């Protein structure tokens, strides 16, 4: 079964973007490259079990096993030594990427309290969009009763767009609810 967002991209979004930005070739149209989910677990320094819980939650949210990130440098103020595990991240590509974006836009973001749309100022100048989520509970896979601690995560949507304008238009066409 083909993904709904991928089919929409090929049938509707590509022609719309070609018209809007006057591309000479369909290959110039920006597309999603990957979505990176990152969960920093600073309290893993004192209790390694917290990292295991974060890895488990990220696995449920993304559908694939996360990579444990480690400290590059030692920082005495944080009681951190080089090489200590301090977070987890997942790179989503292909079908899983479209599945996750679909779920994010249509299920998870509407579950955020006092949600008025995502910020339009989170583009990085190279066509990538970063979104911070304050609590992992907005995802339907996370069972509220099994959560010991509310954790946030960063979601980076990497596109092949050259400018923020093109990237924003691409995400708007996908249905990303930007704040007015």
UniProtKB/Swiss-Prot annotation:
Family classification: Belongs to the universal ribosomal protein uL5 family.
PROSITE patterns linked to this entry: RIBOSOMAL_L5
Name by which UniProt lists this protein: Large ribosomal subunit protein uL5
Gene Ontology CC entries for this record: ribonucleoprotein complex; ribosome
Alphabetic keyword roster: Ribonucleoprotein, Ribosomal protein, RNA-binding, rRNA-binding, tRNA-binding
Any one Gene Ontology BP term: translation
GO MF term list: rRNA binding; structural constituent of ribosome; tRNA binding
PANTHER family associated with the record: 60S RIBOSOMAL PROTEIN L11-RELATED (PTHR11994)
Complex formation: Part of the 50S ribosomal subunit; part of the 5S rRNA/L5/L18/L25 subcomplex. Contacts the 5S rRNA and the P site tRNA. Forms a bridge to the 30S subunit in the 70S ribosome.
A Pfam family it matches: Ribosomal_L5
Main function: This is one of the proteins that bind and probably mediate the attachment of the 5S RNA into the large ribosomal subunit, where it forms part of the central protuberance. In the 70S ribosome it contacts protein S13 of the 30S subunit (bridge B1b), connecting the 2 subunits; this bridge is implicated in subunit movement. Contacts the P site tRNA; the 5S rRNA and some of its associated proteins might help stabilize positioning of ribosome-bound tRNAs.
Disulfide bonds: none
Organism per entry: Lactiplantibacillus plantarum (strain ATCC BAA-793 / NCIMB 8826 / WCFS1) (Lactobacillus plantarum)
HAMAP family, alphabetized: Ribosomal_uL5_B
Domain of life: Bacteria
